[in-house]
């Protein structure tokens, strides 16, 4: 019975959105928002945060749709809340795509595919923010952005991989 919700979330579509599934997606979004809220401001409108931990956990356990929705909504809402509103539409796309790709490429119980998924999704995030920062702020400002984003990806992966395995075991 506990694995039932995981199956439902992994296979969600607009045709099967129940109140229960919407509630879970809202909790995942809040989880990402709280992770993103735990931040350290950086240079030129950057900030290091733990949002990747939450995005990767949701995507690894519940799949591409949940990872994409939670990543897009939770991260962009925190951009607005923390005073980085200019970044919110870009964050919506970048973090949504990151969560979607991690969930799509990951395979339950396969550590190599999960690491690969995080590397691909994380690099999409790094590239997305580098291009956005170059266009919105300046190209020299991209250098510190890349360092911050790689740190988020690496720390996010190192924390999310063992935690997602443990949570997955509890849900199975």
Show the residue positions of the predicted features.
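Loop-helix junctions at membrane interfaces
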Residues: 1-172
